[in-house]
Regions:
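Asp-based, Mg2+/Mn2+-dependent phosphohydrolase catalytic module
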Residues: 1-8, 20, 35, 41-44, ...
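N-terminal helical cap/lid subdomain that shapes the substrate entry/recognition surface
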Residues: 2-109, 113-121, 134
Length: 240
């Protein structure tokens, strides 16, 4: 019997990867970011400056459904008053360290089991994620030996589109040669992920209620998923 769905797209933050707030790790990242930038400011003050400058960038990104690559992010938005030659050279590492300031990211419990299980069952796998930083995800996939399981990795920082923009799903479908209705989306944000996936015509939407997101949510016809799961391994029961 032919499967109803042929591909599964995973969101990252709060879905396939969970951020754990480990203060020593985060403090090291704040210190490292200041060191890389070559600032004379105390590292905590430098971090606060970046946070303040990030707010107008975030407002633009959310409003326009766009994302800057590393060079534009740091040279235009976050450190326009620093040496552009130096910042261009270190922009990828700055993005990586800035994200580590928010926590240490680890694969969700059961995540590797689900990836390998779906791959064995013949599903094409992809990642569609809104995030800054062009290199972190490819580096992580390679280091963890997971890169061979994914047929496409769509990052907003690389394609310069953000969910809920439906075109980001269209791009993923085109890259692996499947129709939107043949795809499953696994994500955690009903407003951003469900809206974009439904607009793109994704066939099935699964919302994962990750450990740090247990607050009540209200579903409407626009954002109602097909499944809500609290254990990531439940995906293997949904997709034969």
């Amino acid at each position: 019997m032919e499967k109803q769905y042929k591909a599964v797209f995973f969101d990252l933050g709060g879905t396939l990867r969970i951020a754990f707030l480990k203060e020593a790790y985060m403090r090291h990242a704040r210190r490292k970011m200041a060191e890389i930038a070559g600032t004379d400011m105390p590292y905590e003050e430098f971090y606060q400056m970046i946070e303040e400058r990030y707010e107008p960038y975030r407002k633009w990104a959310l409003g326009e459904f766009k994302e800057s690559g590393d060079e534009e992010l740091w040279c235009k938005w976050l450190l326009p008053d620093y040496d552009p030659v130096r910042i261009r050279q270190v922009c990828h590492e700055l993005s990586f360290q800035y994200r580590q300031c928010k926590g240490r990211r680890e694969v969700v419990d059961g995540g590797v089991e689900v990836i390998k299980g779906l791959h064995e069952r013949g599903y094409k796998l992809g990642i569609i994620s809104n995030l800054i930083g062009e290199n972190e995800v490819p580096d992580w996939l390679e280091e963890d030996g997971l890169d061979s399981y994914f047929d496409t990795v769509i990052l907003s920082s690389v394609c310069h589109m953000r969910k809920p923009c439906s075109e980001i799903y269209d791009l993923a479908c085109q890259q692996i040669g499947v129709k939107p209705e043949e795809c499953v989306s696994v994500a955690d944000n009903i407003k951003r992920d469900i809206a974009g996936a439904k607009k793109a015509g994704i066939g099935c939407n699964i919302i994962f209620r990750s450990p740090e997101k247990k607050h009540p949510v209200e579903f409407t016809e626009e954002n109602r998923p097909d499944y809500v799961i609290e254990d990531f391994r439940e995906i293997l029961n949904i997709l034969p």
